[in-house]
UniProtKB/Swiss-Prot annotation:
Localization terms from the record: Cytoplasm
Pfam families xrefs: PCRF (PF03462), RF-1 (PF00472)
Keyword Oxidoreductase: no
Keywords linked to the UniProt accession: Cytoplasm, Methylation, Protein biosynthesis
Any GO BP annotation: viral translational frameshifting
Name this polypeptide is given: Peptide chain release factor 2
Name of the gene this protein is made from: prfB
Family that this chain belongs to: Belongs to the prokaryotic/mitochondrial release factor family.
MF GO annotations: translation release factor activity, codon specific
Residues bearing PTM N5-methylglutamine: 254
Post-translational modification: Methylated by PrmC. Methylation increases the termination efficiency of RF2.
Length: 367
């Protein structure tokens, strides 16, 4: 192997070793390692299951800690071993081993970039699960079909990221598509990844519902908010709530819901409305709807505080109906984020859930 290529490998490995050490400091590796020992000890005690909720919380914390501790441990050891092996292989002019180390360096780079990306998650709610609301805009069938395309896109994205996704509510369109839907996404940093998707998404295409093949523009809004837990205090006065029950909508068949199990809760002071119909139990639907309401109220309060403290310009604080964030122009094979100017020509890949280029750019630019 030529000397210049060897020098590049050596420089990369040295750089990765420095970055790995910097990440240990930034991500509190030592403190997390100690905490992981404590959590493991608690989980090994059979008495922990006397309080199932506490045990589940510990299980989630363990997974989160292991995600950092194990990754950094393996990465640090891997880079150190590669550096040592590189010295031997270079001295012996062992090209096969040097090429293998070069391939390992590519893997180290990917893992480092994944950990470094976590530095973008500055919001205290970023590690939490989240809810994602989709609402079709004006325009009837065309807009409702677009809303259903977005629903599919985010479900595909969840699949790619390894998130658990559950459709809690889905209101069908009159002819095709959906009027609205709510998804619950569970996974590490689900809210952190998806929070910059809040806004209006614009579709331009030749409509399949127009026999003349005319070009149509449609809009749908997306709103993402974290699932809050007991560590986030959200007070809800029962007197401020109006609770309605209704029969869940659906295509029918032998499993059609014959009872009024779907629940809609209106928070009258804020005007926030949430609904849940995914379970046959009215009690469980009500509990899920209350969780959604508390999460929305928390996100609303956080946005108010952010606006007051940072006085961000309108383009960053306005998440109303008129705030377009992304334009999907399908007949020109172009999807462009209007905040970061990231543009992708492979429209089908994006609609199949490959949103990482947009999301990463948004987080890096602090959108």
């Amino acid at each position: 192997m030529e000397a210049e290529r060897q020098n590049q490998i050596a420089a990369r490995l040295a750089d990765y070793a420095e970055r790995e050490q910097a990440l240990r400091r930034y991500l509190d590796y030592d403190a997390k390692t100690e905490r992981l020992h404590v959590v493991n000890a608690e989980l090994e005690d059979p008495a922990v299951w006397n309080d199932p909720k506490h045990a589940q919380d510990l299980g989630r914390e363990k997974k989160s800690l292991e995600d950092v501790v194990q990754t950094l441990t393996e990465l640090g050891q891997g880079v150190a071993d590669a550096l040592e092996l590189f010295e031997l292989a270079a001295a012996d002019e062992d090209d096969a081993t040097l090429e293998s180390i070069e391939n390992d360096a590519n893997t180290f780079q990917e893992r480092l970039e994944g950990l470094e990306f976590r530095r973008m998650f500055s919001n205290p709610a970023d590690p939490l699960n989240c809810f994602l609301d989709i609402q079709a805009g004006a325009g009837g069938t065309e807009a409702q079909d677009w809303a259903s395309m977005l629903l599919r896109q985010y479900l595909k994205y969840a699949e790619r990221k390894g998130f658990k996704a559950e459709v809690l509510e889905e209101s069908e369109g009159e002819i095709a598509g959906i009027k609205s839907a709510t998804i619950k996404l569970e996974g590490e940093y689900a809210f952190g990844y998806l929070r910059t998707e809040t806004g209006v998404h614009r579709l331009v295409r030749k409509s399949p519902f127009d026999s003349s093949g005319g070009r149509h523009t449609s809009f749908a809004s997306v709103f993402v908010y974290p699932e809050v837990d007991e560590s986030f205090e959200v007070e809800v006065n029962p007197a401020d709530l109006r609770v309605d029950t209704y029969r869940a909508s659906g295509a029918g068949g032998q499993h059609i819901n014959k009872t009024d199990s779907a629940v809609r809760i209106t928070h009258m002071p804020s005007g926030i409305v949430v609904q849940c119909q995914n379970d046959r139990s009215q009690h469980r639907n009500r509990a899920e709807a209350m969780q959604m309401l508390k999460s929305k109220l928390y996100e609303l309060e956080m946005r108010k505080r952010m606006a007051e403290q940072q006085k961000l310009e309108d383009s960053k604080t306005d998440v109303g109906w008129g705030h377009q964030i992304r334009s999907y122009v399908l007949d020109q094979s172009r999807i462009k984020d209007l905040r970061t100017n990231v543009e992708i020509s492979n429209t089908q890949k994006v609609l199949d859930g490959d949103l990482d280029p947009f999301i990463q750019a948004s987080l890096k630019q602090g959108v």
